[in-house]
């Protein structure tokens, strides 16, 4: 008798568990073999930010929402791709370090090596988004789409741009038309090359622009429309980061009237292995500042790249060091860091930045 009761009890427990499992399964989205597989790596930022009011778009806490909630907020994504969300970090992008970006790049390299993965999306804070995007563009050699996306309004705001940006990013990463275009930046319906796209305004939605290079395309109704066939930006190279454990320190110095010429020397004494100058005009640096730079190059073999503090422009080869040509300081910095990590000599670095 007791055996029968125990057996019935076990049966009821199993039945309840099966019902719970069936309910859980009914809430989840079944895998659709007809849809592409897209992996979303979450880094935090405004797109995952929260404020105390739906009217607040300035004072909020970035990196407050996890990847699961971000995906749940955009149900339409499930009709575009099978999504695999991975939380890498969850912070404002001003706090990201080269170590974080190196870790992300290696995770992406492992993911794109999987034959069933069609594309990658990275949700990211906009403050340093272009830096991460540039690093990925220089280190991920794949035809598969890699799309970096962010938002200018927190997730709690009326008219939050994050959900639509994320939906469009997944659409771009799912499209065969996005193949072979390198790392892309997607915000406000515009698709740009990571090599040229930069943040131009700290507040407005239409902040990411590519200036002279122009946008690669736009997204309409979750369909990417490209203006050009896939092309490689002039001067773009790939660096193998498989054996890189730590990136060298490279500092950016800003040019201005009355510049302290000793700042460059101090940066090197504090551990900088290379310098990027956000120079005035094309590549103008103060005379006494150039004397210090010359000494650092000659005595310490420090590579110094001259970029420009202007929003756009060309850094000419009339400077004392290595001109960045069309790369802004923050993009030139990561290229220099990777070159130093890869054992490039100063002459090699000159060739790397030169436009043939």
From Swiss-Prot:
Gene Ontology biological-process entries: asparagine catabolic process
Active site: 46 (o-isoaspartyl threonine intermediate)
GO cellular component term, pick one: extracellular region
EC numbers for this chain: 3.5.1.1
Alphabetized GO MF terms: asparaginase activity
Glycoprotein is among the record's keywords: yes
Signal peptide as annotated in the record: 1-22
Cellular localisation: Secreted, Cell wall
SMART domains, per the entry: Asparaginase
UniProt xrefs under CDD domains: L-asparaginase_II
Top-level class of the enzyme under EC nomenclature: hydrolase
InterPro entries for this protein: AsnASE_II (IPR004550), Asp/glu_Ase-like_sf (IPR036152), Asparaginase/glutaminase-like (IPR006034), Asparaginase_C (IPR040919), L-asparaginase_C (IPR027473), L-asparaginase_N (IPR027474), L-asparaginase_N_sf (IPR037152)
Source organism, top-level taxon: Eukaryota
Domain Asparaginase/glutaminase: 36-356
Lyase listed as a keyword: no
Pfam families assigned: Asparaginase, Asparaginase_C
Residues with glycosylation annotation: 37, 52, 176
Enzymatic reactions: L-asparagine + H2O = L-aspartate + NH4(+)
Keywords: Cell wall, Glycoprotein, Hydrolase, Secreted, Signal
Binding site for substrate: 93, 126-127
Family: Belongs to the asparaginase 1 family.
NCBIfam families recorded: asnASE_II (TIGR00520)
The protein, known as: Probable L-asparaginase 4
């Amino acid at each position: 008798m007791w055996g029968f009761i125990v057996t019935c009890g076990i049966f009821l427990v199993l039945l309840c568990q099966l019902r719970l499992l069936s309910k859980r399964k009914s809430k989840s989205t079944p895998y659709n073999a007809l849809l592409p597989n897209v992996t979303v790596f979450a880094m935090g930022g405004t797109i995952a930010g929260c404020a105390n009011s739906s009217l607040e778009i300035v004072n909020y806490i970035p990196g407050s929402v996890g990847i699961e909630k971000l995906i749940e907020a955009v149900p339409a994504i499930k009709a575009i791709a099978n999504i695999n969300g991975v939380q890498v970090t969850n912070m404002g992008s001003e706090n990201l370090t080269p170590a974080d970006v190196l870790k992300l790049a290696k995770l992406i390299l492992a993911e794109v090596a999987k034959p069933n993965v069609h594309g990658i999306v990275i949700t990211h804070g906009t403050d340093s988004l272009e830096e991460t995007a540039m690093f990925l563009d220089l280190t991920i050699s794949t035809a598969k789409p890699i799309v970096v996306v962010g938002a200018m309004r927190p997730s709690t705001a009326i008219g939050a741009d994050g959900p639509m940006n994320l939906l469009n990013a997944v659409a771009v990463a799912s499209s065969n038309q996005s193949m072979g275009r390198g790392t892309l930046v997607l915000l406000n319906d515009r698709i740009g090359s990571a090599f040229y796209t930069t943040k131009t305004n700290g507040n407005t939605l239409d902040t990411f622009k590519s200036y002279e290079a122009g946008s690669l395309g736009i997204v309409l109704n979750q369909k990417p429309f490209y203006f050009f066939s896939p092309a490689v930006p002039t001067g773009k190279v790939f660096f193998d980061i498989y054996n890189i454990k730590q990136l060298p320190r490279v500092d950016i110095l800003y040019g201005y009237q009355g510049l302290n010429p000793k700042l460059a020397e101090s940066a090197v004494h504090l551990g900088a292995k290379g310098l990027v100058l956000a120079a005035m005009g094309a590549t103008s640096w103060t005379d006494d500042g150039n004397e210090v730079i010359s000494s650092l190059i000659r005595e310490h073999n420090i590579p110094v790249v001259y970029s420009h503090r202007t929003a756009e422009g060309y850094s000419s080869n009339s400077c004392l060091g290595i001109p960045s040509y069309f790369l802004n300081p923050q993009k030139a910095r990561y290229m220099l860091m990777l070159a130093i990590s890869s054992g490039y000599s100063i002459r090699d670095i000159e060739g790397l930045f030169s436009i043939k």
